[in-house]
Amino acid sequence: MEYAIEMRRELHKIPEPGFKEFKTQAFILDQIRSYPEDRVSYDTFETGVFVRVKGLTGNRTIGYRADIDGLPIEEATGLPFCSEHPGFMHACGHDVHASIALGLLRRIVELPVMDDVVFLFQPAEEGPGGAEPMIKSPLFEKYRPSEMYGLHVAPEYPVGTIASRPGVLFASAREVHITIYGQSGHAAFPHLTIDTVVAQAALIMQLQTIVSRSINPMNCSVITIGKVDAGIRENVIAGRALLDGTMRALNGTDMEKLEQRVRDIIRGIEASFGVKIDLQFGNRYYEVVNDQRVVDKFSSFVKMNANYIECDAAMTGEDFGFMLKEIPGMMFWLGVNNATSGLHQPTLNPDEEAIPFVINLLDHYFREYV
């Protein structure tokens, strides 16, 4: 498995934002083109890649998805193969995800399994979302699998551990972008202005009442405002203010309620403070819902070969949910033993021993158990 670890290190050097993974796509294509054309076929979609490895019978098609984009985070790992792109890093482990797919693909090319195996190297998971356009592409019908699998690295679990659950594994997620317009002016004459900072502060506080007062307390939902911006200097009342945030919910009904309550509160803020507000919702990521039958089959296999944990649902957002709305399948957490640094942190450094572990596990599963 030295090959897969080498792939991870090369990919780690070239993190790229969503739909701009040009070097990453070229690197993946270089690997795929080295295989015999009678065994491996492929197509590109945007900066992603569809790949089919022919099986011995080809009676069914099993799908495996790996996301490939990086994050706008300055790396602080100090690794000898750290990011060569300033301000960008594989801080969510997508380099690991892609290298696992490349290693598994190589294994299956060398030692064919019975079924065809389709690999989806997907762009833009971190945004604006690559799964939905990828499965809506006409190419998807050419590669459509009967079952779909995917994983995500989990720093909190040790190497050798797989964690998942039937039903909802990850939450539905949607970005919120709000611009407040008022009237700027001198700080000494607030009565001649419309202060967007005061409206911004009130809006932030009111948004935080939605989950506690509009959502069933037995359900899990989150609204987080992660970015605010307003003003140009201390003695000028701001005529414009910005808020960016995210909403998460474990079911679609609650997500719709969150959206409606945001609209309601914004109308009230406009009336109360005399401002005008532009509200934009980003792409919605659907819940990742694991198929009961697939989870039962996979977890039974893992329990015989590794450590399996049935975990709780997480408020993490993942656009793999789009694929699982179309195809029965599952996603699971892969332990990578990095307890001191979590996802989206500049020091994330997954234990590379997890790479050969899960390649061997999935190869065995696809070969003998699926």
UniProtKB/Swiss-Prot annotation:
InterPro entries: AcetylDAP_deacetylase, Amidohydrolase, Bact_exopeptidase_dim_dom, Peptidase_M20, Peptidase_M20_dimer
GO molecular function terms listed in the Swiss-Prot or TrEMBL record: N-acetyldiaminopimelate deacetylase activity
Gene3D superfamilies: 3.30.70.360, Zn peptidases
Keywords assigned: Amino-acid biosynthesis, Diaminopimelate biosynthesis, Hydrolase, Lysine biosynthesis
UniProt cross-references to Pfam families, sorted A to Z: M20_dimer, Peptidase_M20
GO BP annotation list: diaminopimelate biosynthetic process; lysine biosynthetic process via diaminopimelate
Keyword Zinc: no
Family recorded in the similarity comment: Belongs to the peptidase M20A family. N-acetyldiaminopimelate deacetylase subfamily.
Designated name of the protein: N-acetyldiaminopimelate deacetylase
Species of provenance: Exiguobacterium sibiricum (strain DSM 17290 / CCUG 55495 / CIP 109462 / JCM 13490 / 255-15)
